[in-house]
Amino acid sequence: YTNAITLLKDEKNLLPLICSKTYYYLPLEEAPFQTFVENLNFGTTINLISKEEISQIPENSTVIVGFHKDNSTAYKPYKISQNSKDILTELSKKQNVILDVFGSPYALKDIDIASISTILVSYENNDLSMKASAKALLGKTKISGKLPVIVNENLKAGTGIEK
């Protein structure tokens, strides 16, 4: 999983996470996320928040948003709900957002990514990918993955930033 993690954007140089900083984590969609938060907390301070607590985040904070899709079978839908898209749009107006997609990169197909400064694809929502993604965000492992598919005209196969 470590080699697969793909960094698509990091415009504000938010990665790797800084151990002395405090970050906020907002899990969206339906699948488990706890392993990711636990592993991020090994290297920095993470405040887990719910959708209802978004307004309490100080402006210009860094918020990690995880799209946790159930991908236990290929027949599960990869699309992100409109509610999650709306939350992401609102967050990116006042916060520095790191979006991590734990599922198909096609989830990004109809999301406006222009205002999101950092985007990663971790491909699967399981304990191994969550641990690998946390290590990558903390700078403990190199990020070198490339998109294996064409998502849309802006996200083509082979896209990926090494960090």
Predicted segments, located by residue:
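Preference for extracellular/luminal or secreted protein segments
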Residues: 1-163
